[in-house]
């Protein structure tokens, strides 16, 4: 059957209608010719009884021995170290200070007894009977002047009151070195050491510092200065000598 459509419809509209009609026709065709399969009836199930076979006993499980843990080894005893003995450094004993020399006692003046002066004998007048050749009598010497008294001179020069001995250098004592130092110095009116000089030292640069340090503390009697005083200081392992 054909439709007489007016010619005024455009081609796109016709094409769209044709496509929709084809789709609807295809769906109708498929629904009519579809075969619906019916499920087949259930078949009986045959069951055959079978006698069970002799069951074998299950294999014996191995006996698991308990694991014995080894005893822990005893820890080694820590032996405490013996305390170290303290090293005692024996310092050299200070040498005794020299005792001040005792002051000399002033000597007592001993007065000598005065001699008696006898008057000289007057000469006799010459006798006319005496021989003129006779020698004139000698007169005794005049002893009018008294005998000279002994004079006591006061000691002169510096007099030490305190002389500190120099300390023995530790290095020289360790090496058992002995030596000698000769010095020259002045003594001031207040009894102190001035112008200290080292004249010689054997061995050199070993004992000089100790000598200077000790002599700065020396004291002399005040009011008795001196210049150019020389002295020798001997360092011996058994002691220090000051000459």
From Swiss-Prot:
The chain crosses the membrane at residues 13-30. Residues 31-243 are periplasmic. InterPro entries: TonB (IPR003538), TonB-dependent_transducer (IPR051045), TonB/TolA_C (IPR006260), TonB_C (IPR037682), TonB_pro-rich (IPR049924). Pfam families: TonB_C, TonB_N. Residues 134-156 have a biased composition (Low complexity). Residues 53-163 are annotated as: Disordered. Homodimer. Forms a complex with the accessory proteins ExbB and ExbD. Interacts with outer membrane receptor proteins that carry out high-affinity binding and energy dependent uptake into the periplasmic space of specific substrates. It could act to transduce energy from the cytoplasmic membrane to specific energy-requiring processes in the outer membrane, resulting in the release into the periplasm of ligands bound by these outer membrane proteins. This is Protein TonB. It comes from Klebsiella pneumoniae. The lineage of its organism: Bacteria, Pseudomonadati, Pseudomonadota, Gammaproteobacteria, Enterobacterales.
């Amino acid at each position: 059957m054909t439709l007489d459509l007016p010619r005024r419809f455009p081609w796109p509209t016709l094409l769209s209608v044709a496509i929709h009609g084809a789709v609807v026709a295809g769906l109708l065709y498929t629904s009519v010719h579809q075969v619906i399969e019916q499920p087949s009836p259930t078949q009986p199930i045959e069951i055959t009884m079978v006698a069970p076979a002799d069951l074998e006993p299950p294999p014996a499980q191995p006996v698991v021995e308990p694991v014995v843990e080894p005893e822990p080894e005893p820890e080694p005893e820590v032996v405490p170290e013996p305390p170290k003995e303290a090293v005692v450094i024996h310092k050299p004993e200070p040498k005794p200070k020299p005792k001040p020399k005792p002051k000399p006692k002033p000597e007592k003046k001993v007065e000598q007894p005065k001699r008696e002066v006898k008057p000289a004998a007057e000469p006799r007048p010459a006798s006319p009977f005496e021989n003129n050749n006779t020698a004139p009598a000698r007169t005794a010497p005049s002893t009018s002047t008294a005998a000279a008294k002994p004079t006591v001179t006061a000691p002169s020069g510096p007099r030490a009151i305190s002389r500190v001995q120099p300390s023995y250098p530790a290095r020289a004592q360790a090496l058992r070195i002995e030596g000698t130092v000769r010095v020259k110095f002045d003594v001031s009116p207040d009894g102190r050491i001035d112008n200290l000089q080292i004249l010689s030292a054997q061995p050199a640069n070993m004992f000089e510092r100790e000598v200077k340090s000790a002599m700065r503390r020396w004291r002399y009697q005040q009011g008795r200065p001196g210049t150019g005083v020389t002295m020798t200081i001997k360092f011996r392992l058994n002691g220090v000598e000051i000459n």
